[in-house]
């Protein structure tokens, strides 16, 4: 019997990659969709099933624990199928229950004869008995962990940083599907492009447009370089460098190159040197720069950002961007699997790397030059504590107070955007100026 590819069979294959083989959800999804013959609407359903199931994983596991006696006795793929089916029954009202059950039974039948009986029994029992009540969980952090599908340590951490009320708003925002967000490369065309794409102005970035849903990468405007996909919060980074056009700029952790290209767009006779550790990522930076028409101002270099001072001399750069490797806690809406692969210990080791990078690049900056330090995380260990530690160990630098018209994203002279404020990625931006040699 020939296996017919359906949206659910493809989504199951992606979810197996993510849950069993520890693949990144966005990479696994793109890989499977690329080779698929499915229609656009079905590909949309695959995306919904994958991101929805991954985002709600802890909640779904808790629900299933009331209907399955011993999950360890089940084949891994079968448990993943039940997770995906439970997601549809609980959260996708547009799909009739009987269709979810029938599709799951058919998938099980194709995979392993006899397994469809268990799938049918579990799903019908859920429909018969209803969903267990999460509010019955007595411990508050555990209850929030299950309700919002976040590990208990992260629930506790965000409450400690932001207080109960704001943390709760952050938790809720992380389960809302992220908007499609683009940067318009030529502001004189912004209005025209906004009309063409039926998009709205970004509340954060003057060059940004947003839309509830949209596949901008397939648009002609993307191919011709009139727009590029970049989150609103990330669009705030390059303008902080206050580029005049003739500077030598270093982008120390550049891949995939969105900020590199943004920096290059401000340059005329200047140049941005973009670093990464991997050749394939450097290729991405070049491709991006080429598409956006700024390749003549971008030079790539394979180099560990912690070794910049060994390769470049003093006074090599006027401006430096360190968009540092970080825990990515601000990206949980777009990359939900991040939350299951982290622990508190990561923050300390990441802080060490972040300070090492700053300590290296600062040696190549001319007097009067600036460093912008940014992350896509919202925990203080990687943000304010890094700023404090860097200034403490480098008296030749001072903090530059950043400004933005949205006052709710300003804190201690830095920009701190949490995901609930504008429905964007969580993000942090700070800046230092070299005042002496």
Predicted segments, located by residue:
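S-adenosylmethionine
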Residues: 1-437
């Amino acid at each position: 019997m020939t296996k017919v590819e359906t949206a659910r069979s493809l989504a199951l294959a992606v979810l197996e990659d993510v849950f069993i083989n520890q693949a990144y959800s966005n990479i696994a999804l793109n890989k499977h969709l690329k080779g698929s013959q499915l229609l656009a609407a079905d590909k949309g359903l695959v995306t919904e099933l994958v991101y929805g199931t991954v985002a709600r994983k802890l909640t779904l596991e808790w629900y299933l624990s009331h209907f399955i006696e011993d999950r360890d006795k089940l084949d891994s793929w079968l448990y993943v199928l039940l997770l995906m089916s439970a997601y549809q029954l609980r959260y996708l009202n547009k799909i009739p229950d009987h269709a979810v059950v029938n599709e799951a039974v058919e998938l099980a039948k194709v995979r392993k004869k006899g397994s469809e009986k268990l799938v049918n029994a579990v799903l019908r029992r859920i429909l018969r008995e209803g969903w267990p009540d999460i509010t019955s969980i007595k411990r508050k952090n555990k209850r929030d962990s299950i309700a919002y599908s976040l590990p208990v340590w992260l629930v506790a951490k965000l409450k400690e940083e932001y207080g109960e009320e704001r943390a709760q708003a952050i938790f809720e925002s992380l389960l809302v599907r992220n908007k499609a967000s683009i940067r318009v490369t030529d502001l004189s065309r912004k209005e025209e492009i906004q009309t063409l794409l039926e998009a709205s102005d970004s509340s954060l970035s003057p060059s940004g447009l947003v839309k509830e849903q949209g596949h901008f990468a397939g648009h002609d405007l993307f191919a011709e370089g009139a727009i590029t996909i970049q989150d609103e919060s990330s669009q705030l980074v390059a303008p902080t460098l206050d580029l005049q056009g003739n500077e030598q700029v270093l982008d120390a952790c550049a891949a995939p190159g969105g900020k590199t290209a943004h920096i290059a767009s401000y340059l005329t006779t200047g140049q941005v040197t973009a670093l990464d550790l991997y050749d394939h990522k450097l290729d991405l930076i070049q491709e991006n720069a080429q598409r956006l028409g700024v390749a003549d101002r971008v030079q790539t270099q394979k180099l560990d950002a912690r070794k910049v001072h060994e390769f470049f001399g003093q006074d090599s750069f006027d401006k430096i961007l360190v968009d540092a490797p970080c825990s990515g806690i601000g990206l949980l809406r777009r990359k939900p699997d991040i939350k299951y692969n982290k622990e508190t210990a990561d923050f300390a080791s990441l802080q060490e790397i972040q300070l090492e990078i700053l300590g290296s690049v600062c040696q190549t900056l001319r007097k009067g030059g600036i460093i912008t330090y940014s992350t896509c995380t919202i925990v203080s260990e990687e943000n304010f504590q890094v700023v404090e530690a860097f200034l403490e160990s480098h008296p030749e630098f001072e903090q530059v107070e950043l400004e933005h018209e949205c006052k709710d994203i300003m804190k201690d002279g830095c920009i701190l955007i949490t995901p609930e404020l504008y429905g964007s990625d969580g993000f942090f931006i700070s800046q230092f100026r070299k005042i002496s040699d």
